[in-house]
């Protein structure tokens, strides 16, 4: 073993010696190459050999944590690299980047609260308006409501006459019946009717008859105070209706339709 070490030392002594600047970041202490034994010991290394070894060692050194760093052959790591390679649970803050802002002026807090509260009320009002606008947009317009119902004044209608009004695009017959008309309507045998229906089922007041003026056959408009039964006559196909609007003769299959209506007052009628 001693012979092998001597041969290696003699081969290293032949390498050219390069001067090392004293300002180099890497410095090798003599303690790493000296021994308690005398200089004649094979383990002692001359300063020139140390410089050569340093030169070749620096070519493979880095700033990472390694065995060479433990031997003092490389300088200390930068703080950032050392923190990354040696993590710790201790948190150290940079006081320069984490400075606390000074507390605000207490006299201005009331103004800030007022502004924030006022903004909330404004936002709530806007949301309320949007909701109301959406709900109201779903309701029917005034034109549609006007067409949905019709108010009629009955005071100008004479007994025994018929008035025609327009409701939802259809004609409506309003007849003020006399006592003879009422008695005639109640004297009809229901068994002889194509669409059996009592007169009391078709009127809310015996004096007033309200029916839609559209023939139930093909949609023609019957003529009032005409026909074989004193009611209405359809000139299109010859259907005859009595004084209660019931079909008595002709091709029409059903009686004249009775719309939804009510009496607001004695002489006020609301259709629809």
UniProtKB/Swiss-Prot annotation:
GO biological process per UniProt: mitochondrial electron transport, ubiquinol to cytochrome c
Instruction: Kindly list the cofactors needed.
Output: [2Fe-2S] cluster
MF annotations from Gene Ontology: 2 iron, 2 sulfur cluster binding; metal ion binding; oxidoreductase activity; ubiquinol-cytochrome-c reductase activity
Tell me which EC number(s) this protein carries. 7.1.1.8
| Tissue specificity of this protein | High levels are seen in the flowers while a low level expression is seen in the roots, leaves and stems.
Q: Which UniProt keywords apply?
A: 2Fe-2S, Disulfide bond, Electron transport, Iron, Iron-sulfur, Membrane, Metal-binding, Mitochondrion, Mitochondrion inner membrane, Respiratory chain, Transit peptide, Translocase, Transmembrane, Transmembrane helix, Transport
> Primary place of residence?
mitochondrion
Q: Where exactly are the transmembrane stretches of this chain?
A: 110-132
Q: Which residues lie on this side of the membrane: Mitochondrial intermembrane?
A: 133-272
- What SUPFAM superfamilies does the record point to? ISP domain, ISP transmembrane anchor
Pfam families per record: Rieske, UCR_TM
Q: What is this protein called?
A: Cytochrome b-c1 complex subunit Rieske-2, mitochondrial
**Record localization:** Mitochondrion inner membrane
Family in the record:
Belongs to the Rieske iron-sulfur protein family.
User: Quick one: which residues bind [2Fe-2S] cluster?
Assistant: 215, 217, 234, 237
What is the protein's quaternary organization? Component of the ubiquinol-cytochrome c oxidoreductase (cytochrome b-c1 complex, complex III, CIII), a multisubunit enzyme composed of 3 respiratory subunits cytochrome b, cytochrome c1 and Rieske protein, 2 core protein subunits, and several low-molecular weight protein subunits. The complex exists as an obligatory dimer and forms supercomplexes (SCs) in the inner mitochondrial membrane with cytochrome c oxidase (complex IV, CIV).
Tell me which residues form the transit peptide: 1-60
**What is the catalytic activity of this protein?**
a quinol + 2 Fe(III)-[cytochrome c](out) = a quinone + 2 Fe(II)-[cytochrome c](out) + 2 H(+)(out)
Organism of origin: Nicotiana tabacum (Common tobacco)
What other facts are recorded? The Rieske protein is a high potential 2Fe-2S protein.
Give ranges for the Mitochondrial matrix compartment.
61-109
Q: Which residues form the Rieske domain?
A: 182-270
